[in-house]
């Protein structure tokens, strides 16, 4: 996890960025200014620790700030016969953009948000990954455009005003729907989308480079057994790539469910010294015993963190403030405690998020089966 911020026609406050997003990138920071464009990057070093410093430049024309990981970047270098001076996936993005423009996005397997300034065309490209795993918010008015990884950062640099109409979505759905945020003129860049900003006119061209809806429209007539084998192969590739893309040790969160248990089982095939972490509660919702069964089965180094009401009284406000907006999902609470404990030992974690949504893990997803 890194933190990025940038602006067109606006001077970034480095102090504010550090104050609000230091937790995203404590290892090093860098800045860039050219004409009316400003970038700032806070780095959490995971891959090519010595050679992946940012902002990164290419040909005295392109400059990038990047948050995320491209799991197949080495494969893409071989596929397109491109060579760089580092082993960094950041440089791979720049090299691919120089060669293919925005068409290269469809080849990326990863979680990412990045911004590239093209000095020759006087544009800034901002792109987000397929699932929206990495966050990006941007503010636009008639005079400037400012973007950052977190709402708290924008709020610290700009006199934002509440957009009361957008709270309808939150009160009805428990979340701000799609691009909407609590603030006027502030938009969340949608998953699988990119912005191309003309730095001279502040005009924005927004495009979807990937849409999950297209895949729902595709029929799959494979027999059940073949579908199981296909999912198994994809899961193994996914977990293996995440383990191999880090120069640091990788661990797993365990919730007691099938999703994180399966991720742990696969990870243990490639890492025989795996660390796992779970939270426990003093009530009927406690799944820690199930998590321990998985940990014992795969012989992991397991840590269990107990959460009590006394913990929550002292930490709840801090947990909520981290999101920069009202947040309805109670899973934020155990996620905070298990992450805080895991950070004592590791920097990179694999979890099982998304499995319930993809495979209808709850009864509430049954009505969608007709689609």
Predicted regions and their residues:
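Cysteine-centered catalytic environments shared across enzyme families
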Residues: 1-324, 335, 339
